[in-house]
Amino acid sequence: MNEKELIEELRDCGALLEGHFILSSGLHSTQYLQCALALSNPKLAKKIAKSLGEKINENFNNKIDYVIAPAMGGLIIGHEIAMFLNLPFMFLERVDGEFELRRGFSFEKGSNFLMIEDVVTTGLSSIEAIKVVNELGGNVIGEAAIIDRSGGCLLYTSPSPRDS
């Protein structure tokens, strides 16, 4: 599925809205994607994950050990991408306002992670989540999102993975 076909499917299911929107960040946009609505359709969620997963495979060439996502927005798409890549999935959740790895999730120090979000606007949730993974001894080697409104500019750079 190419990008044009995906956009058409998102419009058809009512998830892609066009007009004038003020985002929660205060930024303005001419389009708004209701990710929860798009991902509530299992076939569409799988197509979105396949589209992102193919790009991830091209860019990371089997260097990822785990897929991780911050709850809530990244949960469904993160799990779908992990299934496409045949990798373990885990998520971070907020406890008293801070992200934590809970529910028995664990990993070996030095493991490489791919962070998945539904939408990245300011990147603040991603930055917080990446810091937690790094503090626990993991390496976030990349991030993917359905929608990137950040302009590709993150304020935080994760350490580079060790070449193997």
Residue ranges and their predicted role:
Residues 1-59:
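Active-site-facing substrate-recognition patch
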Residues 56-61, 105-107:
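Glycine-rich helix-loop-beta junction characteristic of Rossmann-like nucleotide cofactor-binding loops
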Residues 63-71:
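Short glycine-rich phosphate-binding loop at a beta-alpha junction
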Residues 65, 111, 141:
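Conserved acidic residues
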Residues 77-114, 122-128:
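Short, glycine/charge-rich flexible loops or terminal/linker lids adjacent to PRPP-binding catalytic cores
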Residues 92-93, 138-152:
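ATP-dependent adenylation/pyrophosphate-handling site
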Residues 156-163:
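Conserved small/polar residues in nucleotide/adenosyl-binding loops
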